[in-house]
Amino acid sequence: METLDNLLLKVVDKTMKQVFTETGTKVIYDFLENNSRLKREEIAKKPKIFSTGMKKLLGSGAPVIEKMILKDLYSKLELKLEEKDGYEFSDHIKELRKRLMHAYTYDVTIGILENTVKQAKVGDKEKMTP
């Protein structure tokens, strides 16, 4: 199973290369590293710094790129991106992390319960067997 961080990084790479080509994307990553001290590999862990750096470089174009990234990311997770007033790129990533953590916790809990029920049924059958 792919982590959210890995998926986000792949989506950022793909979107940037589609819009700015390979060379332009390298220039942007270099800018982020030199001006925001943000390495490409850190984008998923530091989305607010990524967003701030993109705004420094691209101005009003940054939110357009961020929205493209978010739409693709949500699509790959089979979720619908809900735009909210006052929400920024980093807010969406933070909320997505929470949603996925809740879903993971739910799946683990259900798995434990199902396993417990199976074990109880096996135990009941063993008691019945002479």
Where are these regions (language model features)?
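Long, compositionally biased intrinsically disordered regulatory segments in eukaryotic proteins
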Residues: M1-P130
